[in-house]
Amino acid sequence: MSIGILGKKLGMSQFFDDKGRSVPVTLIEAGPCRITQLKSLATDGYSAVQIGYGFTREKLVNKPFKGHLSKSGEGFLRHLHEYRVDDLGVYELGAKITVGNFEAGQKVDVSGNSMGRGFAGYQKRHSFSRGPMSHGSKNHRQPGSTGAGTTPGRIYPGKRMAGRYGGKKITTRGLTIMKIDSDRNLLVVKGSVPGKPGSLLNIRPAQRVGSQNLTGGKK
């Protein structure tokens, strides 16, 4: 089972395949990451590999975090993430994780925080239909009815209404890696991924129930 990698979204572009078709892609600067901790079943209760990504200033790192990072011989990393694995024998503390762990044509799942849009109304947040726009109408973008009357006499929990939109963790599954640029640590992924340019992303081999052939990748 291959672990994932952390990266940064650079933006979207286009990629021309072998047949000359234009494919929308997202450029991701992935890694290099360092293995900062190996968690075993004996000491931690489960097997996992923890990696770190992105350097930061020393003044922003507290003493316990410094001691944790010193075990892997790495500098002051900003982001940590761990992946469950079955066999820890193929991983080594302090080893580097790069885009070379992936292959062109491989399916991956990409997770990140979606762009926050603040307080949004019914149309923008839930794609509700608007009201009449003709002269005299007073409910152009109003919610309309939100429930019954005396019975039940309340609005059921979970009713789709206006509120804060975006800014949540989103996972886009089954994206195809179109190209890998090892010299610049770039992954060219087909389609769009969550977040705005510069946001943190978690890229890992695709894992979907009933689709064993999607994982692929190198150990």
Swiss-Prot record:
Residues 124-165 are annotated as: Disordered. SUPFAM superfamilies: Translation proteins. One of its GO terms (cellular component) is cytosolic large ribosomal subunit. InterPro entries: Ribosomal_uL3, Ribosomal_uL3_bac/org-type, Ribosomal_uL3_CS, Transl_B-barrel_sf. Disulfide bonds: none annotated. GO terms for biological process: translation. One of its GO terms (molecular function) is rRNA binding. Keywords: Ribonucleoprotein, Ribosomal protein, RNA-binding, rRNA-binding. It comes from the Bacteria. One of the primary rRNA binding proteins, it binds directly near the 3'-end of the 23S rRNA, where it nucleates assembly of the 50S subunit. Belongs to the universal ribosomal protein uL3 family. Part of the 50S ribosomal subunit. Forms a cluster with proteins L14 and L19. This is Large ribosomal subunit protein uL3. It comes from Prochlorococcus marinus (strain MIT 9211). The gene is rplC.
